[in-house]
C-alpha cells in the first residue's frame, strides 16, 4: 500500500538534541525517531529507519523492498550514542524488514525492529512498516472527560479479556482469530449489557508464543498482528471510548522474550538486559530482565507507556510482575542474584524507574491509570512519589484474592475455623488504593474455574459463588473479573479455545450471568460502593465475628449519608431462623438484591422485601432487624 498523504521533508530526522535526550533517558517521543517512519528526502517519498545499536560494527536494513539484499541499504552511525539511521526512497507501508547487525567479530544478527509499529504474523519474525498517524479519532468527548476523573471516587469494574480466546473465528483461514474490528463490534455490546466500566486487554504488544499469553514480548510498540493492523486496534479503542468504556493494557516491563529476533544480545552485546545473568535473567521464566539502571532502557520503556497513551488513546496500564522487579532475589536461589550497593535485595534502579514512570505518566495525563500487580507487602505502592511511594494509581490486592479463594473452596464445615481469612483484608485496606482481582491466574494450571473451586453439588457450587461475588462487590476496593467467570465458565481457561458460550443456555449459568449483571448495576448505581474505598468512613462491620454460623454482615456508607447499603451473607447450607442483626438506625431496610431468587438460579427461598428496625441492643448497637437467613444466601438492603 502506497503512502497516501504527502509527508513534509525532514532533512535532519534525528538531531543531536534527539541523541542527547535519549542518552539522558528523557526523550519521551523517541519512538517518533527510532523505528520506521514515512518521510520525504530530496523530494522523494520513502521510509526513514533508525535503530540503537551502540556496539555494532555495521547495520543494514534488509527487507521485501530490496530483495533482502544484505548490502543494499547500509545505515549511518550518527554519533557516539550508537544510533544508526538511513532514508530509503520508494519504501511504502506494509513492507517487511529487519535490521542486519554485524558485530565487531563478524557475527551476523537478524533483528526485528524494537520500535516497529507492526509485525509479521507469527511464526514469521520480521517487522513491517506501517502508518499510525492517519486514523481519524472520534473519541474527543471521552478523552476530555477522562482528564477530570478521580478514579478513587469513581466506579471501576474491569473485564479482563484475552481477545484470541474470548470468541473464536469459525473460518480456518483466520486461524481462529477475529480482527480487532470484528471483536470491537461484539465486545462493546457485551460490556455495555453487563455494565463494566473498563476492559483490560491481555497480550496486545507483539509476542511470538501463543502459550505465553502475551507476557513474553518481542514488539513493545506493535499491537499484535494476530488480530489485524495497527489502525484496526485504533478502531477497537475508539469504539470502546464512543461507548464510554475505558481500555487498560497489560504492560510487561519486567522481562522480555529470548527469541533470536528479539531484544536479547541485540547488537551482539547485552544492551537491553544486564550482561550478568544473575541480574539479567529470570531462571523460572526463561526470560531476560531489563537493565533499569541504563538510561536508554528506561527511556525505551517510559516512552513505550507514553506511546500507547498518545498514539492509541489507552486509558491505563496494568503493570505485570511488579514484585519480580522490586526484589533482586525474586524467584532465585542463593548464588543466583547480586545484592544492591547496600547489601540488600531491593532493586534500587527498578524502584527509581517506577517513580520516574508514574511521575511522568500521571503528571502529564490526569485521569490515566497505572495499576501494579504486586504480590508482596511492599509499602506505599500507591503512595505519592514525594512521600517515597512508587506512585501507582492502584494495586491489585493479591492478599485478598488468595484469602478469598482459599476460604471459598473450603467445605462449609471447616469455614468457621478460617472465618477471619475473609475479614483480614479490611485490616490493611487503608494502606493502599486497591483493586480486588479475580484474574486469569486463578483459573488456570489445575486451579479450577471459579465455580468449580466451590464445594458441594452443582447447585451448591453456584449458590456459593453467588455469595462470594456478593461479598466481593460489597467489599471495599475496585473490581476485576476475568472473562467467563461472570457466567460461571466451568472449564479452566485455555488460550487455545473460546469461552463456553453455550453454557448461557443452561439455567444455572444464565442465572449467574444475570446475577453478576445485577451486581454490576448495583455497584455503578450506589456511590457508597465506590466513592470511599480506602477509609473506614465508607465501610463498617456489623458483625465480623459470627464464625460459628459463618455469616458476614457489614455496611457501605456514602459521603452524604444517603442510600447506604447493608450486606448480609450466609456461607453455610444451614438456614438461620430469627437471625438478629444490629443496625445503626431505626429505619426501614429495603431489599435490593437476593442471591436466592430463582431467576438467578437460586432455591427460591424468600427474604423479606422490607424490614423495620426495632429498638433493642444487638451487636453493640441500639437497634436490630430480624430475618430468616436461607442457606448459601446473600442479601443487600438499602436504607
Feature map (PLM): residue ranges:
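The feature marks proteins involved in alpha-glucan
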Residues: 1-48, 76-160, 165-173, 182, ...
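Conserved, mostly hydrophobic/aromatic
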Residues: 51, 99, 161, 191, ...
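Short proline/glycine-enriched turn/loop motifs at strand-loop junctions of beta-rich domains
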Residues: 52-59, 584-586
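C-terminal beta-strand-rich structural cap/linker in extracellular carbohydrate-active enzymes
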Residues: 93-97, 608-639
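Substrate-binding/active-site clefts of carbohydrate-active enzymes
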Residues: 120, 140-153, 162-346, 611
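Conserved alpha/beta catalytic core and glycan-binding cleft of carbohydrate-active enzymes
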Residues: 123, 313-315, 333-496, 503, ...
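Catalytic cores of secreted or luminal carbohydrate-active enzymes
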Residues: 508-529
